[in-house]
Amino acid sequence: MYFICTYCNAYVYDESEGDPDTGLAPGTKVVEIPDEWRCPICGQPREYMQETSEEVFTEKRTRSKKRKDGPEPEKKDLVYYRAIARELLSGLCGVHPVCDGARDRVCSGQKYGKPLGVGGAGQGNTFHANYLALHKYKLKQRVVKEHFEPDMTTTVFGKEVVAPVLGCSMSGVKASMNDAIPEADFYRGLLRGAQEFGTIGLVGNTAAVPDHLGIDMVKENSGWGIAVFKPQSQLRLLELFELAEEYDAIAIGVDLDGCGSAIWAAKGKPVYRKSPNELKELVDSTSKPVFFKGIMTLEDALAVADSGAAGVYLSNHGGRVLDNGQGVVEILPDVAAELKGKLTIMVDGAIRTGFDVLKVIALGADTAHIGRPLLRMSLAGGADAVNMYYNYVKGDLRRAMIMTGCRTIGDATQEILISD
């Protein structure tokens, strides 16, 4: 009998053949598939397998074989790279049409001590809260004006970028991404793809590789990029800051919410909360712009400003360190009311499209940061795919600015928003 996974509508199974790649011997019936088995494409359990016709089975099998064995397609688009990412992240990420951390997503739910993959901490509520908070705001369509071509350019830490869109600082291929590619290649894709597009890439650091690999890759990229470090010991951070200055990085970041990192804890590498005095010491140690990431309250944002930092980065680590937290956008208006114009306000949190970018800019952000979509692109296609995704976002941002009457990024204010 023939079966198809009704979730991804791509994986097919013949009971007579079995599937050696997933450990199913010939003759294994669907009802006999072990509970721990997962669809190799979307990661769903056997309950999603339903009987199908021989015709559908053959068509799906032929299409899959052509993709694996045939020549590469002439046109490599986002759909092509997303399909590759779906295979690389099998069991961790379904590469769904909407990346929102909802309950029915492959990444969602408790992991019971296993690595988070690309999902959120606990039950994944904070990850989903990021999406919900952002989509409480709607864009106001305003079209009775003379036509114009929007100017999307802005300046970030003294560098002009083609749009206020940057990447998130990401790392952890071995622990969180099926060890799909080398960590250095992952960083390289993020940095070079951003540079080719005309913006600035960010990279993190992880416990599975030397903690200076990210800044080493920024050096390889001639200093065009930003390394963001976990809140390691103060002594080690000062050493990493010195390296970043030596390599002429654009700026330096510290991922304060990394103090809740399960990956670093599992590796026996301590990470720490940081006091206001420690923040100031880090800022004073370098001539480079410094920002602190992981800020989710106005109180913490004001402490960052008092340290002399050049930027405050509002983030809950993609919902990966604290469950049942607020969505990032929920705190943005209050922080912007106090700090807009005093330092760079950086924001992430389920930002996927140029329409999302315009919303957070209108709420007071200076830069909008994209995470999981760029993660998938760097794994699947390196710099080319990352650059392609940035251009996709830029196209949406251009359209959003035209439709809301924003000639420049500075014209995007709360006047173009409607909130639920």
Where are the regions a protein language model picked out?
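An N-cap/entry alpha-helix motif that binds or orients negatively charged groups
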Residues: 61-161
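C-terminal helical cap(s) of enzyme catalytic domains, especially alpha/beta-barrels
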Residues: 268, 324-335, 377-398
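Alpha/beta enzyme core
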Residues: 232-347, 355-372
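N-terminal functional module of multi-domain proteins
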Residues: 126-212
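Short, cysteine/histidine-rich loop/knuckle motifs that typically chelate Zn2+
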Residues: 7, 40-41
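The −1 position to Zn-ligating cysteines in a subset of zinc-ribbon hairpins
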Residues: 4, 12, 38
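Short linker/helix segments within small regulatory modules
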Residues: 21-36
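Short, non-ligating residues that shape and space the ligands of small metal-coordination modules
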Residues: 14-15, 48-51
